[in-house]
Amino acid sequence: MTTFNPDIQYVMQQDKDDCYFGRYPTLARLNKEYCNTASVQWLNIQIYNLNEYCGCKDKMTQQQILDCARTISGMYYFLKVSELMLFFFRFKAGFYGKFFGSVDPMVITTALSQFCKERGEANAKHDNDIRMKQINEFRKNAISYEEWKKTRNKKSNNTNTTQ
């Protein structure tokens, strides 16, 4: 878990395909492998970092950070830590709006909902790319019906002449 600390968000975001499709643990996996609060503990660190990053005068309290971490862990247990690191980096970069006056957990969870839509689009594109690659591979060896009939007739004629 310490491998995925906020300091590597910048490195992780450089390869968004790896964030989306790489072999990284999900929040649910963290809970299963370590303890059932591992994802909340990990998210606490990420959210605290975001809280400190923002230039807002009014920061979230420890309780708000904890509640936000629990909400994300409960609702988005299927997200990989790499995806969440991409999200937090993008949030800091202003992809999902900004805070007005105070750091608001609702802004974070609303932004995460938007991120999940983007994730869905990336997954659909990825699946489509894989499908197209398979189709193109199939086409390399494919023949038309007419070519198949000619091949079949040749085989049939060869069989008849050898008998």
Language-model features and meaning:
Residues 1-163:
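Charged interaction scaffolds used for protein-protein
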